């Protein structure tokens, strides 16, 4: 029995690609046809490749491998956070900071700073400081939580990275390639399948499509670590309203956390 059925994928809109004028010719093998100027993804291939991805994730989870989920677009942010947390994995769902993996030693110092501030908040140590200083430290903590909260327990670079929207997360892709970290990625019709290791042709813009694919990948990790799921989870719908779509084609080479004022 396939991990995802054709009916599930049709219902979730997994088959809808981009407008034909916005395609990447390298995705041609995964495209079934076009309708009204929109490419339609071949769901038979998606089902087969999803089985491959599921088995790959489950097998590596059984071996104790660590996973990082990456998806910073508004539609994906909430799903990435919940599904990664559910299966005990790390995630980035706001902005990818340059050097997140290739300069992990520097990033880890910021993660350690976050944990220190949270500890001081929990113990009441911040309340003992002058009001202005405590306020500044709390603002710093909030900013660090926004960008690094999903990797707070990550001790080293991940073994496998799962990506939603390979084009958007190109900086993450490049860092994975430099470090030879395998990439499992949803690929819409405007993506490049050559830069990922485990492709999953699918609509990476629709919330229901993202939820279906990412949810199944999280299932694979969970089952690899804890055994077969007892029942299918009823995943909450997301509208993405709590996440800002503030992506910029900017690389923060010094792993600097961007100021809130500069995000608009």
Curated annotation (Swiss-Prot):
GO terms for biological process: translation. InterPro entries: Ribosomal_uS2 (IPR001865), Ribosomal_uS2_bac/mit/plastid (IPR005706), Ribosomal_uS2_CS (IPR018130), Ribosomal_uS2_flav_dom_sf (IPR023591). Disulfide bonds: none annotated. PROSITE patterns: RIBOSOMAL_S2_1, RIBOSOMAL_S2_2. CDD domains: RPS2. One of its GO terms (cellular component) is cytosolic small ribosomal subunit. One of its GO terms (molecular function) is structural constituent of ribosome. It comes from the Bacteria. Signal peptide: none annotated. Keywords: Ribonucleoprotein, Ribosomal protein. The keyword Ribosomal protein applies. Residues 230-264 have a biased composition (Acidic residues). Residues 228-264 are annotated as: Disordered. PANTHER family: 30S RIBOSOMAL PROTEIN S2 PROKARYOTIC AND ORGANELLAR, SMALL RIBOSOMAL SUBUNIT PROTEIN US2M. Belongs to the universal ribosomal protein uS2 family. HAMAP family: Ribosomal_uS2_B. This is Small ribosomal subunit protein uS2. The gene is rpsB.
